[in-house]
Amino acid sequence: MRYHKIYPAAVCFCAYLIAIGVILGDPAEILPGLLKIIMTEDALITDYVKIAGIGAAFVNAALVTLISLGILRLSEDPLNGFTLVEIGLMAGFALFGKNIANIWPIILGTFLYAKLRREPFGKYASVSLLSTSLAPVVSYVALDNGWGNIWWAIFIGAVIGFVLPPLSAYTYKIQNGMNLYNMGFACGLLATILVPVMTSLGAKPNVAHHWATGYNTELGICLGGLCLVLILTGLLFSGRPVWAAWAGYRRLLLTTGRAPSDYLRMFGVAPTLINMGVNGLIGMAFILLSGGDLNGPTLGGIFTIMGFSAFGKHARNLTPIMLGVVLGSFCMHWNINDSAVQLALLFGTTLAPISGYFGWPFGILAGFLHSSVVLRAGTPVEGFNLYNNGFSGGLLAIVLYPIITEAIRHRRPELQEADYLEDVFEQDSPTIPPPIFKKR
């Protein structure tokens, strides 16, 4: 089995998360904190560090990641770059929205979908994990806030998990590989229908805002250490000469990042690890330099960036997006250090392929537009879609791709309207990278 070291490395990552929780938090408060996480509504923005303490938040992240690894291993999901995406997403969002209880009904629904189609669950295991973007719906219904109960929560969660595989397969194609958080777009569409129906039946969901502050030094040291370990491992301990690892990373920077771009299969372990570490440092630098906070949500955003560093993101295509969000802070009626904008700064890098494919000026434009669109995209779904930036990114990708393509076609005749992928579900076969276009 290729990339067999992913599982041991991921377990070490989980152990690191637990160590952070135990060292920075009070061990005696971890179990009560985990119970509080389970018994709390998880709509955006619910920072587990704020409501349950840093110890419980990081232990929850480790447990959710271990559960995800177990599902991937038992289902024999093929190991590739997208496996690292799943690890980053599940660990990151387990700091603000996903917990060891609310993810199960959705996973069950996808499992039933695979059984109905008489296909191996391994084909849909990654979809089942990503579908937990709507885990806050399960928590809301299960906690019986005058509407619903645990059985309705299991049923609704299973329905969500059941319908998202075909829906996400369709939405993947219409975005032309320009939105990396495809599941966020699919979940946003589903939530746009689901939440109004729930409201019509008597539900009264409320958008939350729990945001921890004061952890920049501690979490900055922990995150910076993790990123440096990844970079040094890629350079020195990956079985390749340092010059070869660095040369591979430089070639990686020339790609567009258009989905699907599996960097692990395209360039190998060393350049991918370097890319993950560098991008993590970039994300942390933007947050700290803009006066933001390192906490559950922002650390979740950085973990997501690091995960997608194995599947489309690199320094050259994500930096213009982030600069576009910063530019928006000088023009719009909001501040760059507002909590929602800090998340847009990190998660807006879902549009990194636009920057890589069309050029950095269009990346800045996409980031600029995203910084405003995302602030309103979550309103119809009451914060129930954790991947709200993916929903906003999908809307912008669908609008911007044909407009930009048509606008610059006379200078870039090689641009094509047709998508080049047919199968959204990851398989363990070689990936052909998208063409790299250079200015003539």
Task: Please describe what each predicted stretch is.
Residues 64-67, 82-93, 104-114, 127-133, ...:
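Short, structured motif recognition centered on aromatic/hydrophobic residues
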Residues 213-214, 248-255, 410-431:
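Short, highly charged, low-complexity non-transmembrane loops/tails of multi-pass membrane proteins
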Residues 1-98, 231-243, 264-273, 281-288, ...:
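N-terminal signal-anchor module of multipass membrane proteins
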Residues 79-82, 242-330:
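Transmembrane helical segments that form the transport core of multi-pass membrane transport proteins
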Residues 73-77, 91-98, 111-124, 135-145, ...:
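Hydrophobic alpha-helical bundle architecture
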Residues 50-62, 93-104, 147-160, 290-299, ...:
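Structural signature of hydrophobic alpha-helical transmembrane segments
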Residues 119, 131-160, 164-221, 377-382, ...:
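Membrane-interface helix-loop-helix junctions at boundaries between adjacent transmembrane segments
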Residues 157-171, 182, 339-411:
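C-terminal transmembrane helix pair
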